[in-house]
Every structure is written in structure tokens, then in C-alpha cells.
């Protein structure tokens, strides 16, 4: 079975996300002094002793508010409880017992999940005992005083959490999942796409821009592989965002790109490529991530048999940073071609991790040189490309040894990259070329050593 799940439940602004960051030793959950900052359920890896588990952070539960998101937040919490070994219920010791806490306790009794009660914001043991006493009235068992921000009482709380987890021998070793992030501007359909992929309401979907404010992690199996899907807050130009939860969510989205194996860049078919889409494309290429471009809302486009070809040409002209990325036209609403995302992403990841022998690299370079010689300067100096070798993967990176790097202009460098792609593939991944000066005799000796090392 997969690692056990611990669900974090409570009303808004009692410190759930702060506790998640404490339990998972991270800063991934957005923490801000505004109620309701976390709206979707988000997953992180938790560790205590020799045990590993998943911590799922849910949106703040409220039962006396008419916000349009509240039914969805309660549904997210129910889904989290359905997969959890224990629900860690968080209350605010400084504010004391509230009617909202009592409503949550009553609702929890209708759910089939064991509970553990933590009284947060107890900054000293003496203070904590007094604050915790009144929470016995909730009927959720012994209240445990803690301070999520300072760590007081959290060790004892985690010891209690472990007693609710299944025995360790019931867990199996898992291959590390492929990290796939869903990236795009607000309201291009990222959360709808995630829900279509998963077949459940995994992220709250609304026509209001910026509905998703955290990065949301989901584990799923497709194409005989395990995936960790990351739906991110919509990324806008920084000057249009005020400091607050949305600002922190945007920064989290950029971090999601950094920790991804492959990014799915979602473009709105009705809007086309915007300046912000171009910035995102550049960020993905700059960070060296594999990528699939998904053009969503294809069902809403009036089209004939030529529309897709014409639109792809137009989009690619503007997304020149990602001319190597496959492009897929989808509809999250109807599910059209959504399943194909995984096939393309799996291929992109495979190419992103691929390594090629030095002999094969140099066969391709020899062919490239036979078709087009390096440029010659006005003074009669000609560039000479001695040999190349792959020095890294993720992304594939090559060092090309030449007589003098400055003799090779951008045009010829792009030509060599195109020839490497045509000869070796690497669809769906950026390729990095490093041009290094070397004396011919030294280059020839180094090439022999490289070939002997690879057998």
C-alpha cells in the first residue's frame, strides 16, 4: 500500500498550514494572517522517527458562511478524510472554544475517520494545560497543547500520530514518482484539467481568477508510471499582484517549475499566447525542464479542418522558447485528448533523462559538418569543431570542443543544435550546448580517452 495519510482539519486561521510546515520541515503551505488562505487540499511528505507519511492540508472549514467556495472546501475535506488514517483536528487555544469548532466536531462524527485533537498557539506548558482543558467538551478525545510556530508539544503530538498509522510492514517501497507541474496564467483551465485527469474534484474550479492559491499535489498512475501532479496558482505579471496569499502562491508556482521533471504549460485557445505565456515559456526553458504545451478550451473554438494547423503555427511563432516542445489541443471540459498528455509527458521525461555515447554524438557532428562548414572570418580564420561529448542529462547537455568559441556565431550554433535534435531526437526537452576552446592535439587525445572509457 502507499504511505499512510494524515489529514489536517480545522476552521480558518487556526494555524493548520503553519503546523504542516512544521511537520514536513518545509515552507510549502502558504501562511498568512488572513482566514481561508488554503482552499484546496495539498499534499506534502511528512517524517517522524523511522516512519514516512503524507500530510494533507485542507481548506479552513466554516459552516455559517455563504461563500460560494464553502461547499467545495467541505467536499475537499471529506475526500481527505476518506483516505486518511487519522484526522489531526486543530483548534486555537488563545481564542478558545468557538461555535465553529463545535460545528466541525459534530461534522467529524459523521465521517468515518479517527481523530486526534491539537490545541494550537499554546506558547508555554503552563498556559497550554489551562487553554486545552475546555476543548474536552468537543468529544474528540484528549486535547494536546502545542505551538506550531515554535514547535512546543509537536514531538509528543507526532508520537501520538504514529499510533494511528498502519504497521510499517504493510507499506511497500515505491519508485519515486515523476514530478509534473501544471503551469499557466490564471483561469486558463489548469484545475479543470487536473480534475479531468484524476476523475474527481481535486481542485476547486470557479470562473473567478486565482481560485487556486496553493500548489496542489496529487499522486496518480498512468502509462505504467507513477506521477506526482502539481497544479499551481495562476502566474501573473508581478506588478499586478499585491503582497498577500496570491503573491506567495505565484512564488510557489515558480518553485514548482524548479522541482518538476516535466511542465505542462497550459495556453487558453481563445486568448492565444500572451506576453505572460511567453515569460513562462522562457522560465521553463531557462530552468531546463521538459515540457508539453497544452492548448486548452479547444471545444470553444470555431474550427474547420485547417484551424488546428494554422493555430499551431501561430502559437509556435510566439512560443519560440519552446519550439522543441510537443503541442496538444485539449478540452478539460469534454476530456478530449486529455489522456494523451501523459504519453507525451512520459516521452519528454525519457528524453530529458537520456544519455548518448560520445561516438554517436560525433557521428551526428560529423554529418552536420559535412553539410555546412563552420564560418570563416574576414581575416580568413575558420572555426574548427574537434569533437563533442554529453556531459549531463536533465536536461541533456553537451560540451563541444572547438579551436575558438567566438568564431561560432549564434546562427551556426543554432544549426548545430538543430542537427543534434534531428540526429538524436530529444523531443520535449531543452538541449544545452557548451562551446569550449581547446588545442587540436589535446582535443584528439581527450576524444580517444572518452571513447576508450565508453568501450
UniProtKB/Swiss-Prot annotation:
It holds the Pfam family KH_dom-like. CDD domains: EngA1 (cd01894), EngA2 (cd01895). GTPase that plays an essential role in the late steps of ribosome biogenesis. Belongs to the TRAFAC class TrmE-Era-EngA-EngB-Septin-like GTPase superfamily. EngA (Der) GTPase family. It comes from Synechococcus sp. (strain CC9311). GO terms for molecular function: GTP binding; ribosome binding. Residues 354-439 form the KH-like domain. Residues 4-169, 178-353 form the EngA-type G domain. InterPro entries: G_ENGA, GTP-bd, GTPase_Der, KH_dom-like, KH_dom-like_a/b, P-loop_NTPase, Small_GTP-bd. NCBIfam families: GTPase_EngA (TIGR03594), small_GTP (TIGR00231). Associates with the 50S ribosomal subunit. Keywords: GTP-binding, Nucleotide-binding, Repeat, Ribosome biogenesis. It comes from the Bacteria. The keyword Cell wall biogenesis/degradation does not apply. The gene is der. One of its GO terms (biological process) is ribosome biogenesis. GTP 1 binds at residues 10-17, 57-61, 120-123. GTP 2 binds at residues 184-191, 231-235, 296-299. This is GTPase Der. The keyword Acyltransferase does not apply.
